[in-house]
Amino acid sequence: EAIAQGRQRILLTLATGTGKTCIAFQAAWKLFHSRWSLHAQTHPAAAKKRPRILFLADRNVLANQAFNDFGPFGEDAIVRIEPGEVKKLGAVPKNASVFFTIFQTFMSGPEDEHGNKTPYFGQYPEDFFDFIIIDECHRGGANDESSWRDILDYFAPAVQLGLTATPKRTVNADTYSYFGEPVYSYALKEGINDGFLTPFKVLPIVGTLDEYV
């Protein structure tokens, strides 16, 4: 609904283990099969073309997990962007519909003749991606002082969906300032009450380790 209403930045807050990747998959799947794209919104004839979707994470384990979960799209539609493969090919991959990478890979890149780093994300046109999913977006991607923010600003034309398990706090206020208030939230307590998460108890343990350090 948020995409249909023209929202450019969207935030979902769900407790860990309650299906953030599944929701990201379903959103991408629907856009992919409906042939939705930013260009098609103003040029209906362009609706014949599949959208280009980027999944950004801050750790390889998350990017790899998402890449495997998105397998139903078909091996010709998805691609994992890795620095070794980019160096081998001499360029970033562009012949796919759903791209997976981590911020660190996109921020890396060769130096130009003046010794300035040219990040790999700059090899894509600014309007290359229609939809960007930012997993664990509270980890710094929306921070004004973060170099990761350069990626989000560069691909500003795309609809950006931030996923986080962290409720609003002082330390992640930048995330909420950038994306706005969540369009949907599902708290840890709700996940436990609904049977999706295991109840837990916090047991304080008093140790003597500090006496020996």
Q: PLM ranges: what are they?
A:
Residues E1-V213:
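RecA-like P-loop NTPase motor core of helicase/translocase proteins
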